[in-house]
Amino acid sequence: PATIISNMTGIRCEALKVSLRDGEAGSFNDSASWMAEDAYGILDGKIASGSPTAKKILIVDDINDTGATFQWITEDWESGCHPGNDKWHRVWGGNVRFATLTENLASNFGGVSYSCHALNKAEEDVWLVYPWENVGQYDD
C-alpha cells in the first residue's frame, strides 16, 4: 500500500521491514536512523529548533490487526532516537502518522490517523488475505 501511495503522490517511499508473527521477535530496516533525522529536521548532525526541514512521515501497513506492529515501531523508534528530548512528543504527534487499509477497531493501538475501512475482529473473527501476500506456491 505504501508504494501505491508513493507512486500516486510522487513522494519518496522508504521501506521499513517489521515482522512480529511466525516466531520473529521483530526486525527493523538497517537504516532506521533516517526516520528520526527526517522527523526532527536534523541538519549537519544537530537538531534545528523549529526547523522547516522537519519532514512529515506516514507509516503505512495493510492492516492494523492487534496493533503490535505499530506499537513496536513506536517503542523501538522512541527508545533508539532522542528518547530524552522533550521534542520527541511534539515530533511524534505532529510529524509522524499511521495509515492502514484495514483498521481493526479491537486493536490495542489507537494511533491510526487514516484508514480505508474498519472491522471489529472482537465481534467477527475474520482472516483477510491481500493480493500481495504469499498464499501458496505458484504453479506454471
Where are these regions (language model features)?
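Generic structural signal for beta-strand residues in well-ordered domains
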Residues: 6, 50, 89-91
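Hydrophobic alpha-helical segments in the ANL/AMP-binding
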Residues: 1-7
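Short, glycine/charge-rich flexible loops or terminal/linker lids adjacent to PRPP-binding catalytic cores
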Residues: 8-58, 65-75
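PRPP-dependent phosphoribosyltransferase catalytic core
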Residues: 75-140
